[in-house]
Structures are given as C-alpha cells and as structure tokens.
Design a protein with these regions (language model features):
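Interfacial loop-to-helix junctions that mark the boundaries of transmembrane helices
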Residues: 3-9, 28, 57-75, 179-189, ...
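Membrane-interfacial loop-to-helix junctions in multi-pass transporters
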Residues: 8-13, 71-75, 101-114, 140-150, ...
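Hydrophobic mid-bilayer segments of alpha-helices in multi-pass membrane transport proteins
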Residues: 10-21, 28-56, 72-84, 225-235, ...
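Juxtamembrane and boundary regions of transmembrane helices in multi-pass small-molecule transporters
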Residues: 26, 32, 85, 91, ...
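Short helix-coil transition sites and intra-membrane helix breaks within transmembrane domains
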Residues: 28-31, 85-93, 119-131, 159-167, ...
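Hydrophobic transmembrane alpha-helices that form the pore/transport pathway of multi-pass ion
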Residues: 107-161, 172-176, 329-344, 399-400
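Long, contiguous bundles of hydrophobic transmembrane helices that form the permeation core
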Residues: 194-262
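Transmembrane helical segments that form the transport core of multi-pass membrane transport proteins
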Residues: 231-337
Length: 402
C-alpha cells in the first residue's frame, strides 16, 4: 500500500497533529476549534494523499469509521451521561454532608483523593473524577486549585489502572487474554504515585482555600437524587461486568456501557429529572475530546519499539497527547510487555495534561480554569513527578517480567 507524504522522514499526519496539540496548549480558548479543524483537516489529507490503515479513499475512511465508532459513541455517551450524573450528585446536597464528615485541615484533601482512587477501581474513571470534583467544589467552597484538580484526575486514572473494570485499556487487556492478576500489579506503582501526588496537592489546596465545616446546612440531603446516582452507577458496573464476563465477543460491537448509563438516567427520570441544561457544555467538551481521539486514530503507527521498561515508561508520556486505546492495541498485538507496567503507564500517563484523558476533559468542563496546559504543568507539577516515581518504585519492588 502506498504511503503518505513525509517531511524529513516524519509522516505529515504527525506534524498536523503536533500543530493541533500545540495550538491547544498555547491557546486554550481555541481548543475546541483547533481539535475539530485538525480532525477534519487530517481526514481530508488522508483521503487525498495517505491511506487509512483499512485502505485508501472513501472505502478506507468508512472502514476506519466502522472500526472506531463503538469507542467514540461509548465515550460520547459516558461524558454526557456522567455530566448529568454529576449534576444529580450536586443537587442531592450529599457533598455538603460530606463536607462535615471530612473535617478540616490538609488531611481533608488527602482523604478525598484517596476516595477518588478507590472509587475509580470499580467505576469508570470519568465518573470518579466528576464526583470527586463535585465534592471538592463543596468542601473547598468553590475555590479548587488547578494543582488539586490535576491530582483528582491523577487519582482517578491511577485507581483504574490496576483494575480490569476500572479503565478501557485494562478491559482491553483482559479481553485479549491478560490475567487480571497481571494487571493488578499496576497498583504497586499507582498507590506510590497517589502518595506522591496527594501530599503536595493537599497542601496546595489547603493554602489556597482550606476545607472548613461551615454552618450546619438547613437543607437536608435529597435522598431521591442520591438514589438516582446509586442506581446509575450500579447499572453501569453491572453492565460492564456482564458484557465482559458473559458476552466478551460483543464488547467491541456495541457501546453497551454508555447505553447502560443513559438507560439508567432515563429510567430514573420519574424520580428525579436530569438537569438537561448541563448538556450543551458537556457536548462541547465531548466534541473536543472525540476530535482528538479521532485525530490520534488516524496516525500511521504500525508498531511500537521492542517491549522494555524504558519503552513502557515513554508510552506514559506519549499517552498524555496520544489516545491510549490504539497504543494499548498495538502493545497487545506486539506482545512481550509486562502488562502491569503498561496498564499503569497508559492509564496514569494521561494525567500529565488536562486533555490527556477523558477524566481530565470532563473535569475541565466543570472547572474551566483547568483548561490551561501551562497551569496544569506548573501547578500540577507533582503529577509528572509521581508518574516517574511510581514507575521506578514498581521496578524496584517487582522488577520487569515480560
């Protein structure tokens, strides 16, 4: 099959994608338009000058879309559904009750991050991050430090990295025959990284806007909204387990997880009506992330370097700007990896930038001040340190076992 154009040996697709990412990092206000323009521009370029993995021209484009649609629709449904779920949680006033339970001082921020980590181990990391963000908004009186927002995303991605139901990439490994125990070892790195992130982030947040119990709320918890949140989460977990345990062959055929979230929201409407006004903002964020995922899927990556721990470490940094699903698919096809390391790298690595993971994009929709690559990198400096530290702790404790 003919190859596309190159510049100094680099396929033009990569240069176009780098231009998109550079624009997003430099001009956050243009992020949505830059991502959409990149998705359209790279698609047109591949139609005219460079074949898709599935073939050239319109046939290749349609075949590629057929290959990607389940993941894209699932992601869209989850981002929109969990945006409505987060509003249910905020409207329940449960976060106000938690504000009194969590207490005061720097330990409050640490405990909340630990809770997000645990929640993400059995729940989608998007939901874990958004629930964590909703609690943080209440506990810290609406003033949440960007460094702490980065820590919430890191905690959610770390929590899902060692669980075969906690992240799409780990589920992919499970479906490909990787034993859950091999993925579970990622928690050695993830737990270490959580400690490195949580300590400075909690102190950052305490200096910026400390947690206070405040006056006793006169409005009781809306248990109807709490019931809706619990129902949606339980149905999502049940659907995820059922599909992957009993109908694994269908997991890549239809967006069952996203559908289950929306089915639960609609079934619960008689009890509590969703706050539909939250959808336009969530849709803009979803369109941004879907455009980036589509761009990443168009990159002509046919193979990864031979598996080793330095390559796996580098994959984590790459996953901050490149969709981790095709990275994981390539690694599974190639083989030779220690899967615990890969699960940690492609999971936690997405926390390095606000647009590096779906959890980050979802949280940035709740807190627009997070949409700054400079602020994320400078104020969330501990995320990068934690990623490297966690990786080398795991290497020292377990060694590399391919």
């Amino acid at each position: 099959m003919a190859q596309g154009l190159t510049l100094a040996g680099v396929p033009l697709e990569f240069l176009f994608f780098a231009l998109v990412l550079g624009t997003i990092a430099a001009k956050p206000a243009l992020a949505g338009r830059a991502a959409a323009a990149g998705a359209l521009g790279i698609s047109l370029y591949k139609l005219a000058c460079s074949p898709f993995d599935e073939g050239a021209g319109w046939h290749g484009l349609l075949a590629h879309a057929g290959h990607e649609w389940v993941g894209l629709v699932n992601l869209l449904a989850l981002l929109l559904g969990f945006a409505l779920l987060a509003r249910h949680f905020e409207n329940s006033r449960a976060s106000h009750a938690l504000r009194h339970a969590l207490g005061e001082g720097p330990a409050t921020g640490f405990i909340l991050l630990l809770g997000v980590f645990v929640l993400a181990s059995f729940l989608d990391n998007i939901a874990a991050a958004m629930i964590g963000g909703a609690i943080a908004r209440s506990v810290f009186r609406g003033r949440v430090h960007v460094g702490y927002l980065a820590a919430i995303v890191a905690a959610s991605n770390a929590g899902g990295s060692g669980s075969v139901i906690g992240d799409t990439t780990t589920t992919m490994m499970w479906l490909a025959g990787v034993p859950p125990a091999a993925v579970f070892t990622a928690y050695v790195a993830a737990a270490s990284a959580l400690l490195v992130v949580a300590l400075p982030a909690s102190l950052q947040q305490h200096r910026y806007s400390p947690a206070v119990r405040g006056p006793v709320e006169h409005h009781p918890v809306d248990w109807g909204s709490v019931a809706v949140v619990g129902f949606v989460l339980c149905l999502a977990i049940a659907a995820n387990l059922l599909v992957n345990l009993e109908f694994a062959g269908w997991a890549g055929v239809f967006p069952f997880l996203g559908l289950s979230v929306w089915l639960a929201l609609l079934l619960a409407t008689p009890l509590r009506r969703p706050e539909w006004l939250a959808l336009p903002g969530a849709l803009r964020s979803a369109a941004f992330l879907l455009s980036l995922v589509w761009c990443a899927s168009l990159m002509p990556v046919q193979a990864l370097p031979p598996a080793s721990w330095p390559v796996t470490l580098a994959a984590g940094f790459v996953s901050a700007v490149f969709d981790n699903i095709p990275l994981t698919a390539l690694a599974l096809k190639q083989g030779g990896y220690d899967w615990g390391y890969l699960a940690y790298a492609v999971g936690f690595g997405g926390s390095l930038l606000w647009f590096g993971s779906s959890a980050g994009v979802a949280l940035a929709d709740m807190f627009p001040e997070a949409r700054s690559a400079r602020a994320w990198l400078t104020q969330g400096w501990h995320v990068g340190v934690a990623y490297v530290a966690g990786f080398f702790v795991m290497l020292a404790v377990l060694g590399w076992s391919a």
